[in-house]
UniProtKB/Swiss-Prot annotation:
Flavodoxin-like domain span: 4-184
Protein name: NAD(P)H dehydrogenase (quinone)
Residues the entry annotates as binding FMN: 10-15, 83-85, 118-124
InterPro entries according to UniProt: Flavodoxin/NO_synth, Flavodoxin_CS, Flavoprotein-like_sf, Flavoprotein_WrbA-like
Cofactor detail note: Binds 1 FMN per monomer.
Listed GO MF terms: electron transfer activity; FMN binding; NADH:ubiquinone reductase (non-electrogenic) activity; NADPH dehydrogenase (quinone) activity
Family assignment from sequence similarity: Belongs to the WrbA family.
Amino acid sequence: MARILVIFHSITGNTMKLAKAVADGAREGGAEVAVKRVPETIPAEILEKNPGYVKVREELESFEVARPEELQDYDAIIFGSPTRFGVMSSQMKQFIDMTGRLWMERRLEGKVGAVFTSNEMPHGGKEATLLSMLLPLFAHGMIIVGLPPAKELYRAGSYYGAASTGVPKEDDLQVAKMLGKRVAEVAEKLC
């Protein structure tokens, strides 16, 4: 049974919802799944002024904070981040930047990797974010898994990974589940 880590950053809960759907899909695919979040770097007094954050704070905080060194313990890692100006959030970037030692020791080489994102605007740069999130995975020598051609992609997601605009709709969640299941199936074949 493949072990999969779904790791995400979210402030308003949209990326968290996708993370949960990705995890559900991976479980459907027969994997053992952990869902964790990256450390938040925005000061609490700033976050508390965001009504979207206040609504989901307790649920967000219920997820354990991941540590970079634990990535090596999984067969597959699926990274999720909100889109910020066409790239991943600084919190996710900082977390990935802390994987330098794993890179030097080639600890993630051969592991399966995939990505997902959410943003607030239809043209906010989701595909650019997905592509930029894949670059560190390539640098680590990970085996990248995207989404195959599917009718669901006509309305939601991208070949590069799952994506949503605003609160994820049912189509978005279905594509996220497809991604999780596909990663689980590929990881199982490689284990």
